[in-house]
UniProtKB/Swiss-Prot annotation:
Name used for this protein in its record: mRNA export factor ICP27 homolog
Subcellular location as annotated: Host cytoplasm; Host nucleus
Compositionally biased spans, kind Basic residues: 129-144
One Gene Ontology term, aspect cellular component: host cell cytoplasm
Subunit-level organization: Homodimer. Homodimerization is required for transactivation. Associates in a complex with RNA, and host export factors NXF1/TAP and ALYREF; these interactions allow nuclear export of viral transcripts. Interacts with three host shuttling SR proteins SRSF1, SRSF3 and SRSF7. Interacts with host SRPK1. Interacts with IE62; this interaction enhances IE62 transactivation.
Biased composition (Basic and acidic residues): 98-107, 154-164
Zinc fingers typed CHC2-type, residue spans: 335-426
TM segment ranges: none
Record's function text: Multifunctional regulator of the expression of viral genes that mediates nuclear export of viral intronless mRNAs. This immediate early (EI) protein promotes the nuclear export of viral intronless mRNAs by interacting with mRNAs and host NXF1/TAP.
Pfam families referenced in this protein's UniProt entry, alphabetically: Herpes_UL69
Length: 452
């Protein structure tokens, strides 16, 4: 390999890509000296990768740094993260006219840079490495790193000193100026609210608490007397929730329960309040049974061609039931929606409940949430009836639903998902614990085709 020489012709121009990420304030002499050093070391011909390009003669002008456009890495704590890019670099030498040098061709030379060193068969260029080392030391001296953490006493002193109070007053003045400029009202507690909060609880006595308990007890006793009477079914007592009721039995006696809700308006309001109280504290198993109770009730009324009133205790508490199911099955449904194959469907539980599309139904879990969300939305809007078309797209309302499938189907989905997923959140969040102090008020029947 022949040694490269540097011509002194001032017309020679050079465009050089940044090999060593030099600082922008470097003098032109250092830049030209470094390129000259590369030529003298005869390392321009080292090839990157499997390239076999040989070395060429390099021409450098003293003013070549005018075309020098370096690319720098980001600074962190006064030091550079990566001073050199770990990839091959190219030195491009361009002549405005080849006749200035006797028709000689000047071609591109290559150099390989690895971790700040120029690899070649003969030598290394250590000049840039020394510069990087010296600059790093000077940066450490000029730009100290993060100051040491303050002790509790120092932090308290800084909080209570005069400079801190001065900064706080300036910030408060700036906020006040902005508020006046844009006419922003001041957010403050009203005098009436201050008076109410300060005197809260002053009138509570033992007698007033006892009177409240007696009033609630009278309402519960009145409701329990009606629930245990013969008015629930024609010719006998309604089976209740202690034993399972078959679908034919519910079709036989269900209209009597419907008539009871229509006859006792006051007791229906009590039933709604007690049922909502029970539903909000139900466990997962009990919440799934309540979901089956709601959907079975809707299916029975549609089969008998009866109007579905929203003031019915079973229908009126659908919003509380939906909130409890979201709380119990939220992590499981979130993982289920993210991993399903349908890319066009809803990907989150809030999106599923907001859109309430029949096309989002892919399993019994999504079916339960979409149906109950549709019913709850109608109740919240204040409608008097639930239209059949709002809850079913078939001629026979809820034809695809089997009584008891919410409990059996969701438990089956949980078991299958636990085997496939294995996430701890999906398993522990659906732990079916029972509340020992939950009373069965507001629960009217249990109808399930499955033995579970």
């Amino acid at each position: 390999m022949a040694s490269a020489s540097i011509p002194t012709d001032p017309d020679v121009s050079t465009i050089c890509e940044d090999f060593m990420n030099l600082l922008p304030d470097e003098p032109s002499d250092d830049f030209a000296l470094e390129v000259t050093d590369w030529a003298n070391d005869e390392a321009i011909g080292s090839t990157p990768g499997e390239d076999s390009t040989t070395s060429r003669t390099v021409y450098v002008e003293r003013t070549a740094d005018t075309a020098y456009n370096p690319r720098y890495s980001k600074r962190r704590h006064g030091r550079r993260e990566s001073y050199h890019h770990n990839r091959p670099k190219t030195l491009v030498v361009v002549l405005p006219d080849s006749n200035h040098h006797g028709g000689r061709d000047v071609e591109t030379g290559y150099a390989r840079i690895e971790r700040g060193h120029r690899r070649s068969s003969r030598s290394y260029n250590t000049q840039s490495s020394r510069k990087h080392r010296d600059r790093s030391l000077s940066n450490r001296r000029r730009r100290p790193t993060t100051p040491p953490a303050m002790t509790t006493g120092e932090r308290n002193d800084q909080t209570h000193d005069e400079s801190y109070r001065l900064r706080f007053s300036k910030r408060d003045a700036r906020r006040e100026r902005i508020r006046k400029e844009y006419d922003i009202p001041v957010d403050r507690i009203t005098g009436r609210a201050i008076e109410v909060v300060s005197t809260a609880g002053a009138s509570v006595t033992i007698d007033s608490v006892r009177h409240l308990d007696e009033t609630i007890e009278k309402l519960v006793v009145r409701y329990a007397t009606i629930q245990e009477g013969d008015s629930w079914a024609s010719g006998g007592c309604f089976p209740g929730i202690k034993q399972n009721t078959s679908w034919p039995e519910l079709m036989l006696y269900g209209h009597e329960l419907y008539r009871t809700f229509e006859s006792y308006k006051m007791d229906s309001r009590i039933a709604r309040a007690l049922r909502e109280r029970v539903i909000r504290g139900e466990s997962l198993i009990e919440a799934l049974e309540s979901a089956d109770e709601l959907l079975t009730w809707i299916k029975m009324l549609a089969a008998k061609n009866l109007p579905i009133y929203t003031n019915n205790p079973i229908v009126a508490t659908s919003k509380s039931l939906l909130e409890n199911l979201k709380l119990k099955l939220g992590p499981f449904v979130r993982c289920l929606l993210l991993n399903r194959d349908n890319d066009l469907g809803s990907r989150t539980l809030p999106e599923l409940l907001r859109q309430q599309r029949f096309s989002d139904i892919t399993c019994i879990t999504t079916y339960m949430f979409v149906m109950i969300a549709r019913i709850a939305n109608i109740v919240v809007r204040g409608s008097k009836f639930v239209e059949y078309d709002d809850i079913s797209c078939n001629v026979q309302v809820l034809q695809e639903y089997t009584p008891g499938s919410c409990l059996a189907g969701v438990l089956e989905a949980l078991i299958t998902h636990q085997r496939e997923c294995g996430r701890v959140e999906c398993t522990l969040s659906t732990w079916a614990g029972h509340l020992s102090d939950a009373r069965p008020y507001g629960k009217y029947f249990k109808c399930s085709t499955f033995n579970c």
